[in-house]
Amino acid sequence: MSVRQTLPYCAAASRDIGKPMRPLCRYVVLLATVAAFSTLVHSQKPSKQRAQTHKSAPTTQSQTSSGSLTIKSEPGAIVWVDDVRRGVTDSSGTLTLTKVTGGRHVIRVRATGFKESSTPVLPGRSHLAARLVRTTDEAELKFQQAEEAREKAKDDDARQQAVDLYSQALKLRASFPVAHVGLARALMDLNKNENALSEIEAARKSRPSYPEASAVEGRIFREMAFADEATKSFQRAIREANGFQPEAHVGLARVYEDRGQYEAAAAEYQVAIKQLSDSEPVIYQLLGATYEKLEKYKEAVAAYEKYLQLAPNGSLAPAIRSIIDQVRREASSREIVP
């Protein structure tokens, strides 16, 4: 039974059996959450290190105001804001982002068969026409195929196909840092972590300051149970991005959770949520689970409910509805106990 198939079963069984079923629901939601977050930004193992003082680099992006931005481009084009993926244009080539923080941004747009474009956007702008030019660059086309293959991959055979496509792109263009990072992600998905680290190193040769590469490096180190190295890489990513690197903030949160530093983990999740402008509901599930560990049940329920508000039909929704009921019952029982 797949994770997706198990979620509805988990929700129903939890209502019938009650608290004994709850650990299974937690486990299933965790599996599904990890899978969901792996695709977050295209998206972490325990350490025995002592708790360390939590301090993240301040973000330079304004979080106090936001507006909408409508991008017009090719149908099915992927849109990034400041290197954070925010969505895909519809069949008419339109994507409206309802929450874009104030300040200057860089909008990156990519569509299969076209040359990628990057456009700076000044504060107050509400519309952007991103006109793409068709490309015959074989390296670029292979890279685009690799990205699509990795995102759609459901098993190791498909992931290996993505690896092969990235490798072909790099043979055609040796200096291709974004392809090295994509290949690192694909290798990490295959648990080839040493090879993945080599690709991060290769990416930095032509782009020494590369926030996404540092964030992916942090994830690889966490998979290898090197918590201190993971922390350094995530902090480097945040520093390189002047504070705006949600993947790294989530990665740090996972490391802090591993160490039992739940307050610090919750703070990092909250930063990531603000930077992603509610575009990734799965982080609310992670935040809710952290609040539960802190026995902050009201906050946990609020986080879970926010997930359901943003993704009422999401793959985690059935289990999360069940968990909300369980958390409320647990909170009520604790209030009754003298």
List PLM regions with ranges.
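Canonical tetratricopeptide repeat
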Residues: G182, V216, V250-G251, Q285-L286, ...
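Alpha-helical linker/edge segments of TPR/alpha-solenoid repeat scaffolds
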Residues: D137-E138, D228, D258-E263, Y297, ...
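Terminal, low-structured helical/coil segments at or just beyond the last alpha-helical repeat
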Residues: K293, V301-P338
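Start-of-helix register in tetratricopeptide repeats
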Residues: E140, V178, E212, P246-E247, ...
